[in-house]
Amino acid sequence: MALPIIIDCDPGHDDAIALVLALASPELEVKAITSSAGNQTPEKTLRNVLRMLTLLKRPDIPVAGGAVKPLMRELIIADNVHGESGLDGPALPEPSFAPQSGTAVELMAKTLRESAQPVTIVSTGPQTNVALLLNSHPELHTKIARIVIMGGAMGLGNWTPAAEFNIYVDPEAAEIVFQSGIPVVMAGLDVTHKAQIHAADIERFRDIGNPISTIVAELLDFFFEYHKDEKWGFVGAPLHAPCTIAWLLKPEIFTTVERWVGVETKGKYTQGMTVVDYYFLTGNKPNATVMVDVDRQGFVDLLAERLQYYA
């Protein structure tokens, strides 16, 4: 039986590719997609979900827009990474269908209520919508199998020296998720910076030769440029969000540890930092499965294999 999932995302190039991967995978049943503000404004990320589902010919999947700002802060966006549209690069279709009239939280709650089995929530943007769901529907916690997030880092940040972007945007929401008691799987920068797509990989995807693999290559062409900056020390571009879906499909290509994670919400220098108790110093029981490494070639091969689904 396919694993039921809800995807909460803020497309964004890597989020768009995560959608492509999820919808090419019969092991997963995508029951709903909700949009969060982060990589771009809430209007643009919602539009980008609809554009991607139009491209992938999946207007049957319910879509709803989420919170317009973080729980307690003003919104920060990453337009310097993802461009004016949030998906700059390829020519994507205009949406062929409309989102649901309700909110992301309402769609998530309805999906959980109606599911015969617990649902995995995959959250690849800031955690605002998921935190709102957890706070407003405690009766539905048992319907959530796990929450798989792209966010955080044991080591270095990518938005501040200490903080990864998604967590920095809404640290209060992330703290709610980590302390919810629901199993959390964290794909942070420790693993996503190892899930780099090289120039040769982009050409491999392009050579698959179907319309979707071509679009993915064009998304990566744009995304690649930002990551050429020498400060990162990258060979390629890190594919953050797809690590969440790849872990659901092939956990064996990832190395993980079980640790307690908390989120710093007030630090002068460390606001938005995910504090990972690697050496069990706090006495707190582990609340997260933390990805620390990935078989990069296995990750690339999985993407290439699933892109052939769209032939």
From Swiss-Prot:
InterPro entries xrefs: I/U_nuclsd_hydro_CS, Inosine/uridine_hydrolase_dom, IUNH, Pyrim_hydro_RihA, Ribo_hydro-like
Protein name as it appears in the record: Pyrimidine-specific ribonucleoside hydrolase RihA
Known function: Hydrolyzes cytidine or uridine to ribose and cytosine or uracil, respectively.
Gene behind this protein: rihA
The family this protein is said to belong to: Belongs to the IUNH family. RihA subfamily.
Biological processes per GO annotation: nucleobase-containing small molecule interconversion; purine nucleoside catabolic process; pyrimidine nucleobase metabolic process
GO molecular function term, any single one: uridine nucleosidase activity
UniProt keyword Disulfide bond, yes or no: no
Documented EC number(s): 3.2.-.-
